[in-house]
Amino acid sequence: VETPPPLPAAYDELSAASSGCPPLPPISGFVGRGDGVLLYDAFAPYRATGTNLYYLQQLLAYAQQDGNPRLAAAVGEVLDDLVCLSLPVARIWGFNDSPDRSSIRKGPDDFQEAGLRGLDQAVWEAKRRGIRLIVPLANNWADYGGLPAYAAWASKRDGVVYTRDDFFSDATMKQWWKDYAALLAERVNTFTGVRYRDEPTILAWEVANELRCQTCRGTTRLTDTVRELAAFLRRVMPNHLIADGGEGFDDQAGLYVGLSNSYPVRGDEGTSFSALAALPELDMVSYHYYPKSYGLESPRDTAVWIQRHQAIATALGKVAYLGECGYIGADSERAASFDAWLGHLFEVEGGQLGLMWQLLPSARASNDAFSVYSRKDRATAWILSRWGRDLR
C-alpha cells in the first residue's frame, strides 16, 4: 500500500457541511438497471464504493427517545466521514424485530412508531448528504430479531417450536414479512415528507440479509422464497431496484473452478447464487467476502470469488455487487486487502458496486474484529477515499 497522504484538514471536524470536504452530488433521481448495468438518470453508468452502517436506525431511535445529542452527533460524524471519503453508498438495516426499545416491530402486528422514526431519520440524514442506501428488510441471524424472531412469534401462535429455517415453508411467516414491506412502502417519512416507495435515496431493497437454510435439503426452497418475496416487493416498491441480500453461496461448484475450498459453492447452506441470479424478479444479486470465515484464504481465491460472481450475473443481465467484505488484521494489512479486492471488482465487466464492513463512529465500541474507525485507521481510510474519488 502506498504511504497515505494527509486527508483533508476538514476531515477531522464533525460536520462536512461546515468543512472543506467537497459535498457529494445531491440525490435527484432513482438508480436503475440496464442490461446488467446500474444506470443513473437512465443512461449514465453508476459506479461507487461504500460501507455498511447497519446500526443507524437503532442509534437514532435511542437519540430521539433520550433527547441525546451525542448519539445524533455520532451518526452525523460517520455520515460526514462518508462524504469526506467520497463514499456515496451505505447499507443499513431497515428492520428491527428485537424486544429492544429501539424496535420497529415486537410482534406480527405490533409496530413501533418510535423505531420507525429512527429509520425515518436515518434516511433523511443520508439524503441530505447525498448518500444512497441499500436496505435489507429482514435478517437471517438473531441480531435485531431476524428470522429467529419470526420463528418465536410463530411458536407462540401455535404452541410448537419453530426455527428460522421454517420461514421458508411457513406461509404465515412470509406474510408477516410482506406486511412490513407493504407498511413501509406507504409510510410517509416524518423527516422528509416522502413515501418510502417514492424515495430516490433508496438505491435498492434487499429481501433479507444473508439468508441460509441448512435444513432445506437443496436450494429450491430458499430460491422460491426469494422469488415470492421479491415479486411482492416489486409490486409495492415499483421505483426501486430489488436484490436478494445474500452471501453469494452456490450449489454449482463447477462455476467456480480454482477456489481452494468448495464449502461456499457445494450447497451446504441451502443457497444458490446462480439460481437467484436467474430470477426475473431480481435486479441485483449480492455476494459477500470474508476470506477466513468462508475458508477462502488462498491468494487466488479473491479473484475467482469476485470474477465468477460478476460473470454469472452479467451473463444473465443482472447486476452483481459486493454487499459486504471484511478483513481481520492490522490497519495496513486491511488497507492492502481492500485495495486488492476493489481492484478485482472494478476491473471486471459488470463490477460497479462494493461495500466494506464496517465503518464506525469514534464513540461507538467495536462489536466485531472487522470494524474500521476512519479517523484512527488512516491507511484504510486513505484507500477507501482514493477509490471513492476515482469512481466519482
Predicted regions and their residues:
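Active-site groove signature of glycoside hydrolases
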Residues: 92-96, 134-217
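Aromatic-lined substrate-binding rim segments of carbohydrate-active enzymes
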Residues: 62-155, 219-243, 306-313, 338-346
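The substrate-binding groove and active-site-proximal loops of carbohydrate-active enzymes
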Residues: 57-71, 100-117, 161-177, 205-220, ...
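Short, solvent-exposed turn/loop segments enriched in Gly/Ser/Thr/Pro and often Arg
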Residues: 52-55, 90-98, 136-145, 208-211, ...
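Aromatic- and acidic-residue-enriched segments that line the glycan-binding/catalytic groove
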Residues: 102-114, 128, 138-171, 175, ...
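Extracellular glycoside hydrolase catalytic/binding regions
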Residues: 179-190, 204, 208-352, 361, ...
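N-terminal carbohydrate-binding accessory modules
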Residues: 4-109, 124-132, 182, 231-234, ...
